[in-house]
Design a protein with these regions (language model features):
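Small-residue-rich midsections of specific transmembrane alpha-helices
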Residues: 1-22, 76-84, 137, 174-177
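Interfacial/gating helices of multi-pass transporter permease domains
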Residues: 1-7, 63-67, 123-128, 162-166, ...
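Alpha-helical transmembrane segments of multi-pass integral membrane proteins
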Residues: 2-7, 38, 71-75, 86, ...
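Membrane-water interface segments that mark the loop-to-transmembrane alpha-helix transition
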Residues: 4-54, 63, 67-73
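C-terminal transmembrane helix end/exit motif
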Residues: 15-18, 84-91, 95, 115-119, ...
Length: 177
C-alpha cells in the first residue's frame, strides 16, 4: 500500500548502481543529494496522496491511520537515507559497518517499538518513538561512520539530475517490482 509504494520512489533502485560505480563517475555527495531529492519527492507524493484522498472522501484511512502512514513513511525515509551511507561504507571495503548498522538499527527500533507499544498501547506514539530511535542511530552511528570515507562537497544539480536520469530504468524496475 502507501508505505510500500513511496519508499520505492525514495530508494530509486540506486543502491546497486552506487556500489558498482567503481570508477567513481558520481561522487558520494551527488548520491547523497539525489537521495535527498528522491526522499523529498516520496514524502510530498505520500502527503499529497493522503491529503487528496481525505479531501475527496476516497481515503481508506482514518485520521489516526493517516498519521501512522506518515510516521512509518518517515521511518522508511531514514532507512532510505541510511542506504546511501551504507553504500559509501561498502565501496570503502567496510561491509562490517553496514552489518553493524542494520543490527543496531534493528535492535533499537524493535526495542523502542515493542516497549512503547507494550507500555502505552498507543500506536501513534510508538511509531513516533520508533522514527526517533531510527534517527538517533542514523545521526550517532551511520552518518559518522560513512563520513570517514568521503569529503563532503557541494554537488552540482546537473550532476544529480544526470545520475537520476541514468538510474531511471532501475527506479522504474524498483517501482514495478
Amino acid at each position: 500500500t502507501a508505505t510500500g509504494i513511496f519508499p520505492s520512489i525514495a530508494s530509486y533502485g540506486m543502491y546497486s548502481f552506487q556500489v558498482s560505480d567503481i570508477r567513481g563517475k558520481y561522487g558520494a555527495s551527488t548520491y547523497i543529494r539525489s537521495r535527498v531529492w528522491t526522499c523529498a519527492l516520496a514524502v510530498a507524493l505520500c502527503i499529497g496522496f493522503v491529503a487528496v484522498s481525505a479531501l475527496t472522501g476516497e481515503n481508506p484511512y482514518s485520521a489516526q491511520q493517516s498519521v501512522c502512514v506518515l510516521l512509518f513513511l518517515g521511518y522508511r525515509m531514514v532507512e532510505s537515507l541510511t542506504d546511501i551511507y551504507n553504500a559509501i561504507d561498502q565501496r570503502s571495503g567496510r561491509l562490517d559497518i553496514v552489518g553493524k548498522t542494520y543490527a543496531v538499527r534493528g535492535a533499537v527500533t524493535l526495542a523502542s517499538f515493542t516497549l512503547t507499544l507494550w507500555l502505552t498501547q498507543d500506536i501513534v506514539l510508538t511509531l513516533a518513538l520508533m522514527l526517533g530511535a531510527s534517527l538517533v542511530v542514523f545521526f550517532v552511528y551511520s552518518l559518522p561512520q560513512a563520513r570517514a570515507f568521503y569529503a563532503p562537497e557541494q554537488p552540482q544539480n546537473a550532476r544529480v539530475a544526470a545520475l537520476l536520469w541514468e538510474c531511471l530504468p532501475l527506479a522504474v524496475y524498483s517501482f514495478l517490482n
